[in-house]
């Protein structure tokens, strides 16, 4: 229990000096001790100070600086609750932001009152573009702006009375935090994925296996004969972090590359809405694809919304099929294998041409010197030579997004002037490039089967290519047939079903050395570099030959240097040929260093990219468990206690992780996927005991509001709009103008943002908390209506009046020793049982409804004074929702300790059983009356009561029913 506060908040604060806006004008004459916005402000301010002074929400760790000072063990019953932490924007919070924070606070407070050791803290995801863009505009260092925003966020969140352990708060921009982000990067960099063991292992173990001869090189070279540089190349190719010349999403308007997940479906940047181009650049990549199977399979053990699981499954995109090797001839005469992946190997005999992604590595090698005799002009794209046609086609599609390329109704492409041999038929087929084939999926090459794939059919029709039927059942002259059937025109496969043919052709490809069964994924490796300033620097330097070297852990943190200009070189948003130029390159003294990496002092250059904004959020849950540890990112004992598997509690396949994580579904394939990947690597390397970061996830809905636009589509301030005669007008500078209402997000740009400060000023933070929780289920979006806040305010006033005399400030509670009457006991214990069940399930809206119902019951039942035994449980039940008011009433009721640690009241099952049952009485199927009988009444007693009811008798008018049907506990039906 927490010690008693030394001050009595609100009890001597005096009468309110004015009326908060939004509250009934009658409150200007309110009694001195009424619960008003001013009184609430005093109560809330003082209790927040008390909680901070007493460390009410400080939670102990098993070991380290936050362990109990007396050496006592931590409670076994723990709960780790986490919110997706906010980005501290300059605009501050609007009323939609606290929805999830309040919900988790109610959940945490309830379980804390039930005696659990609850970890609940909140940090800030503070790296990112907005602070950097502000710095570019003003010349202010991003840290200055970010820290000011964090101060404002903490002030706003503090007003809400959230029960966070403030000792555990941090920002991802804190050097003490991003030191460990860099450390984790090094763990991943210095690891490789052992496919046989299906896990990551230290790279040193791979080197040892090569040195000992236990592992051979896949290309057949002798490890012992390789030079130091060649060995380094081999090792670098195995690392989980590697550099690759790969196709990336280049955004000239932002001056940086973007991950696939940061590009919208129409090929523009998610932030700024600039065009994004596909460009080949050398970039840092993380080998997340090595974990594709585990990321998919472990979704089954997570208590997550089906929507999020489906989004991750679709993003990872596992496909089962086969690879097939077509042989082609390079322009220099060498034979080369062209590997394709297909989920339909059964259609191999129907492959009449090949299509490569325009970015495929082999395209330039396969371009013919000239057009073959008799080439169809439709195939050439108007080019004088294949090389000219390919170059022109690549230029034409450079600005298209992947989605545009895949969904385009018009199929285009050009012939390379060369052919490949179909391994099933032995016949040559022409090779094309086309934009509907993507380099990032499969092998970047497809075998085109126009008879049974509609995109291939469309392409074949457009370019006059042959269409062959290999599965009977459709009319391929009209469209591709994608249904089931038996194989035809397929040699030894003829007559087989699709399933049989898949197995048979795969076996033949394997035996002939022309292919094999294979699983492919849509998931691509994670592009892990940004050409920005405000992000975590890489702990990487380059030697004079351009070879990367990881810094030793002792060199961490690598701190961001000051630079004269924070902006990358920005380009015309449509300039696809531009090249990135990171801001850190301007800090020349920081970039160029002399270091001793074990072979003497030598010159090196630092990496001038920074990590993406997702880096800090990929592991921050772990830092909450041990935020002050200077020696490790977190002590294993603390991680095991807060996040380790608990099979006795959660089942034998419990993956461990945070007990409850709440945040938006928009992060399903970004933050949540990246965090799972990092956590699994840390698990494989033995740094954590949990194999997943988040055991249970809930996606909160959104608070939405009306916005208003004028005839030009420009938004006007929503609070100034007047509703009149079924329409809306805005009093502009030149008089009233008609405006148009729309419903959706809340935001500064829509001019409909409402600050929680306004509601706290006008009603108090507890009212805001109760209102937001009463609006609907946590997962549902809901409309904001300031006019409805008064309902929550008046509910809290009624609770206050049950305890406090508004005129005198005296306690109204009856300290009678007599036992409560049966009706009150039944109402009390039903409320306790229902509210407890709702809190545990995060059904806060129905908990509010039950508390209102019980409050109304007490108000009507006990008009003079409510018995203490009836009111104290109400105060305890209200505490998770309205903690300031509850603490104040609890103290005024004579208690000397805070109720933050309980006890939460327990329901007596004896009062949860109904003594009576109400039966609707139907006559020929229509309800004509209702009767109340004892819960254990037999059918005869129920029939007698129904027939004796005055309303039923009046309707029967002396007639006798032919039949009386009793459905036990539900209804009586009289058939006349």
From Swiss-Prot:
It is found in: Cytoplasm. Its EC number is 6.1.1.4. Residues 1-34 are annotated as: Disordered. ATP binds at residue 748. SUPFAM superfamilies: Anticodon-binding domain of a subclass of class I aminoacyl-tRNA synthetases (SSF47323), Nucleotidylyl transferase (SSF52374), ValRS/IleRS/LeuRS editing domain (SSF50677). A motif ('KMSKS' region) lies at residues 745-749. A motif ('HIGH' region) lies at residues 86-97. InterPro entries: aa-tRNA-synth_I_CS, Leu-tRNA-ligase, Leu_tRNA-synth_edit, M/V/L/I-tRNA-synth_anticd-bd, Methionyl/Leucyl_tRNA_Synth, Rossmann-like_a/b/a_fold, tRNAsynth_Ia_anticodon-bd, Val/Leu/Ile-tRNA-synth_edit. GO terms for molecular function: aminoacyl-tRNA deacylase activity; ATP binding; leucine-tRNA ligase activity. It catalyses: tRNA(Leu) + L-leucine + ATP = L-leucyl-tRNA(Leu) + AMP + diphosphate. PROSITE patterns: AA_TRNA_LIGASE_I. It is an enzyme of class 6 (ligase). Residues 1-23 have a biased composition (Low complexity). GO terms for biological process: leucyl-tRNA aminoacylation. Keywords: Aminoacyl-tRNA synthetase, ATP-binding, Cytoplasm, Ligase, Nucleotide-binding, Protein biosynthesis. Its main location: cytoplasm. One of its GO terms (cellular component) is cytosol. PANTHER family: LEUCINE--TRNA LIGASE, MITOCHONDRIAL, LEUCYL-TRNA SYNTHETASE. Belongs to the class-I aminoacyl-tRNA synthetase family. This is Leucine--tRNA ligase. It comes from Mycobacterium marinum (strain ATCC BAA-535 / M). The lineage of its organism: Bacteria, Bacillati, Actinomycetota, Actinomycetes, Mycobacteriales. The gene is leuS.
């Amino acid at each position: 229990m927490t010690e008693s506060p030394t001050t009595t908040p609100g009890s001597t604060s005096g009468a309110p000096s004015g009326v908060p806006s939004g509250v009934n004008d009658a409150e200007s004459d309110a009694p001195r001790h009424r619960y008003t916005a001013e009184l609430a402000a005093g109560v809330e301010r003082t209790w927040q100070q008390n909680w901070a002074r007493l460390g009410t929400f400080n939670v102990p760790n098993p070991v380290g600086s936050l362990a109990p000072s007396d050496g006592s063990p931590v409670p076994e019953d723990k709960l780790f609750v986490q919110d997706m932490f906010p980005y501290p924007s300059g605009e501050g919070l609007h009323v939609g932001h606290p929805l999830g924070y309040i919900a988790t606070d109610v959940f945490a407070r309830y379980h804390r009152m039930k005696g659990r050791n609850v970890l609940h803290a909140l940090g800030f995801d503070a790296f990112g573009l907005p602070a950097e863009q502000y710095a570019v505009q003003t010349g202010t260092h991003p840290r200055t702006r970010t820290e000011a925003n964090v101060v404002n966020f903490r002030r706003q969140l503090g007003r809400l009375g959230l029960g966070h352990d403030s000792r555990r708060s941090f920002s991802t921009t804190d050097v003490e935090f991003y030191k460990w982000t860099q450390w984790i990067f090094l763990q991943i960099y210095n690891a490789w994925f052992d496919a046989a063991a299906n896990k990551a292992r230290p790279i040193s173990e791979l080197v040892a296996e090569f040195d000992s001869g236990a592992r051979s090189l896949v290309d057949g070279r002798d490890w012992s004969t390789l030079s130091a540089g060649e060995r380094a190349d081999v090792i670098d190719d195995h690392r989980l972090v590697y550099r690759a010349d790969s196709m990336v999403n280049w955004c000239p308007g932002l001056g940086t590359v973007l991950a696939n997940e940061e590009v919208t479906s129409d090929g523009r940047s998610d932030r700024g809405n600039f065009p994004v181009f596909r460009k080949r650049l050398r970039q840092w990549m993380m080998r997340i694809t090595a974990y594709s199977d585990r990321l998919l399979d472990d979704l089954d053990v997570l208590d997550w919304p089906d929507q999020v699981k489906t989004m991750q499954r679709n993003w990872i995109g596992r496909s089962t099929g086969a690879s097939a090797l077509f042989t082609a001839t390079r322009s220099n005469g060498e034979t080369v294998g062209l590997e394709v992946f297909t989920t339909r190997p059964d259609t191999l005999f129907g492959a009449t041409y090949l299509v490569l992604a325009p970015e495929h590595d082999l395209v330039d090698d396969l371009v013919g010197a000239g057009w073959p005799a008799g080439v169809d002009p439709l195939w050439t794209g108007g080019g004088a030579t294949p090389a000219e046609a390919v170059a022109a086609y690549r230029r034409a599609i450079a600005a298209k997004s992947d989605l545009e390329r895949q969904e385009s109704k018009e199929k285009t492409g050009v012939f390379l002037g060369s052919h490949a041999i179909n391994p099933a038929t032995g016949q040559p087929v022409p090779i094309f490039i086309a934009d509907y084939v993507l380099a990032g999926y499969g092998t970047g090459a497809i075998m085109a089967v126009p008879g049974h794939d509609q995109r291939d059919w469309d392409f074949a029709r457009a370019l006059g290519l042959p269409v062959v039927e290999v599965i009977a059942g459709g009319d391929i002259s009209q469209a591709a047939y994608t249904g089931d059937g038996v194989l035809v025109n397929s040699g030894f496969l003829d007559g087989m079903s699709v399933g049989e043919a898949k197995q048979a052709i795969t076996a033949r490809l394997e035996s002939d050395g022309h292919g094999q069964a294979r699983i492919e994924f849509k998931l691509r490796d994670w592009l892990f570099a940004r050409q920005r300033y405000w992000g975590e620097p890489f702990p990487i330097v380059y030697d004079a030959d351009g070879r990367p070297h990881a810094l030793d852990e002792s060199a961490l943190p690598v701190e961001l240097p000051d630079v004269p200009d924070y902006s990358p070189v920005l380009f015309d948003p449509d300039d696809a040929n531009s090249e990135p130029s990171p801001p850190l390159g301007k800090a020349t003294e920081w970039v160029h260093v002399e270091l001793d990496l074990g072979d003497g002092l030598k010159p090196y250059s630092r990496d001038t990219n920074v990590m993406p904004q997702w880096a800090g959020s990929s592991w921050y849950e772990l830092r909450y468990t041990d935020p002050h540890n200077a020696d490790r990112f977190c002590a294993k004992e603390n991680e095991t206690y807060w996040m380790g598997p608990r099979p006795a509690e959660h089942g034998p396949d419990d993956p461990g992780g945070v007990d409850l994580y709440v945040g938006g579904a928009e992060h399903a394939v970004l933050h949540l996927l990246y965090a799972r990947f990092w956590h699994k690597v840390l698990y494989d390397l033995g740094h954590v005991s949990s194999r997943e970061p988040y055991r249970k996830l809930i996606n909160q809905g959104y608070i939405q509001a009306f916005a208003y636009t004028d005839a030009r589509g420009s938004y006007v301030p929503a609070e100034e709009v007047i509703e009149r005669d079924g329409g809306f007008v805005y009093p502009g500078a030149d008089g009233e103008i008609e405006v148009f209402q729309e419903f959706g997000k809340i935001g500064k740009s829509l001019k409909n943002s409402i600050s929680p400060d306004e509601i706290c000023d006008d009603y108090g933070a507890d009212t805001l908390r109760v209102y937001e929780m009463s609006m609907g289920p946590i997962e549902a979006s809901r409309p904001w209506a300031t006019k409805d806040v008064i309902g929550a305010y008046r509910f809290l006033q009624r609770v206050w009046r049950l305890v406090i005399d508004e005129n005198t400030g005296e306690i109204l509670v009856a300290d009678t020793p007599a036992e409560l009457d049966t009706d009150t006991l039944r109402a009390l214990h039903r409320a306790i049982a229902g509210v407890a069940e709702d809190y545990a399930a995060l059904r806060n809206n129905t908990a509010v409804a039950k508390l209102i119902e019980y409050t109304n019951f007490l108000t009507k039942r006990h008009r003079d004074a409510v018995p203490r035994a009836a009111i104290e449980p109400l105060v305890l039940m209200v505490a998770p929702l309205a903690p300031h008011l509850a603490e104040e009433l609890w103290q005024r009721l004579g208690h000397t300790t805070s109720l933050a640690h309980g006890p939460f009241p327990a329901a007596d099952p004896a009062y949860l059983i109904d003594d009576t049952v109400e039966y609707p009485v139907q006559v020929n199927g229509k309800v004509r009356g209702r009767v109340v009988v004892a819960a254990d009444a037999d059918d005869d007693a129920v029939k007698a009561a129904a027939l004796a009811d005055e309303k039923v008798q009046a309707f029967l008018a002396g007639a006798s029913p032919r039949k009386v049907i009793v459905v036990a506990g539900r209804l009586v039906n009289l058939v006349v």
